[in-house]
Amino acid sequence: MKLPADLRSYSQITRNSIAMILAGGRGTRLRQLTDWRAKPAVPFGGKFRIIDFPLSNCVNSGIRRIGVATQYKAQSLISHIQQGWGFLDGRFQEFIELLPAQQRTEESWYQGTADAVYQNIDILRSHNPDYVLILGGDHVYKMDYAKLLADHIAKSAEMTIACIDLPLEEASAFGVMSVTKDGRVTDFTEKPSVPTAVPGRPGYALVSMGIYVFNADFLFDQLIRDHDDPNSSHDFGKDLIPHLVPRSRVFTHRFSDSCVNMVSGVPYWRDVGTVEAYWEANLDLVQVTPDLNLYDQDWPIWTHQEQLPPAKFVFDNDDRRGQALDSMVSGGCIISGATVRRSLLFSNVQVRSYSVLEDSVILPNVDVGRNARLRRVVVDKNCIIPPGLEVGFDPVEDRKHFYVTETGVTLVTPEMLGQKIHYVR
């Protein structure tokens, strides 16, 4: 990977930092995709899970002390991290530590994002960091956190919020900020109904990415103060940040200053929090030159690597031809006399003869029966698609059996097909 010229100073900053990834959220807007897994454990991009992106950003940035706070249906997330992220070397104080809600300080689960960090304050303190990086575990992006940390130090900030411009119609789902010319935050409102536009850029708001850097001692003091506040919901966006903005040195960091290898000059960051956004972000990857470059060897996305054979395409007859066009097909897949167009197939998917898949996202271990036709669908892990099933052509009929978004993207799960699968996904 490419390293900055002043590597020594960056290395010292990252060595003295610890990252805390908040990975306990359910992600209810993903509907049945999160019935059996936390949002950070949802598969993405053919072979990854969403959690792999912030974890990879940490490792690639030189941050090798990482805590992952888990809560909601965490088993698949825990298994994934244990199987795929055991390569850090404890002899050099490198680790990924899983931090489930343990009721360490009182008899309650994590009550909010700030409380999730507060309940692990003793663990964080034991590592004696200078800086604490707070990350969400449910966004897809590539960011050099070393540059974020360096910016935080250069501004003598007590807290730094990574930010990005979003259209006003999308900004209501995030924390929205107003800032001075030098980037100091003057106002912060969590999920406002009417977001404030960026001066000089009508139609856009400056929003928080849910990525924060704190001076460690400052953070610990603020977490204790917030914990003792009976009126607080113990959330960074709702409580902690609005309290700090008028009282402390809170600055922003533009994502464009630390986004890694931008393809089109626009930083890529996706909150794949709805079925439609998830479908769109996956299918973005089948473009000739996608905005998210998964083939970037300078900034690899690390994950659990299953030992799988290559994808196979069989039959080349006039009436059935195994082929995939403008698509990504992962290891272990067999396209047997079927046609796949503009689709993304995760590992171990079998598509049987005479079937057609178009604009579809197929998660691992799916078996598509003969003569099936799937269009604009997301198919969850382990589904067995019956022969001849058609989905994506009649929204009225589809809604009787599956979940269909307003724009006609259909989610199919084993339960919707009457298939009971009683294990983690």
Swiss-Prot record:
Any GO BP: glycogen biosynthetic process
Gene3D superfamilies with a match to the protein in the record: Hexapeptide repeat proteins, Spore Coat Polysaccharide Biosynthesis Protein SpsA, Chain A
SUPFAM superfamilies linked to this entry: Nucleotide-diphospho-sugar transferases, Trimeric LpxA-like enzymes
Residues noted as binding alpha-D-glucose 1-phosphate in the record, renumbered to the chain: 110, 175, 190-191, 208
The protein's Enzyme Commission number: 2.7.7.27
Pfam family, one: Hexapep_GlmU
Keywords: ATP-binding, Carbohydrate metabolism, Glycogen biosynthesis, Glycogen metabolism, Nucleotide-binding, Nucleotidyltransferase, Transferase
Name of the top EC class for this enzyme: transferase
Highest taxon of source: Bacteria
GO-annotated molecular function: ATP binding; glucose-1-phosphate adenylyltransferase activity
Keyword Nucleotidyltransferase: yes
Catalyzed reaction equations: alpha-D-glucose 1-phosphate + ATP + H(+) = ADP-alpha-D-glucose + diphosphate
Pathway(s) it belongs to: Glycan biosynthesis; glycogen biosynthesis
Transmembrane helix found in the keyword field: no
Family named by the database record: Belongs to the bacterial/plant glucose-1-phosphate adenylyltransferase family.
Role played: Involved in the biosynthesis of ADP-glucose, a building block required for the elongation reactions to produce glycogen. Catalyzes the reaction between ATP and alpha-D-glucose 1-phosphate (G1P) to produce pyrophosphate and ADP-Glc.
HAMAP family on file: GlgC (MF_00624)
Quaternary structure, from the entry: Homotetramer.
Protein name in the entry: Glucose-1-phosphate adenylyltransferase
Organism: Nitrosospira multiformis (strain ATCC 25196 / NCIMB 11849 / C 71)
Lineage, highest ranks first: Bacteria, Pseudomonadati, Pseudomonadota, Betaproteobacteria, Nitrosomonadales
Gene of this entry: glgC
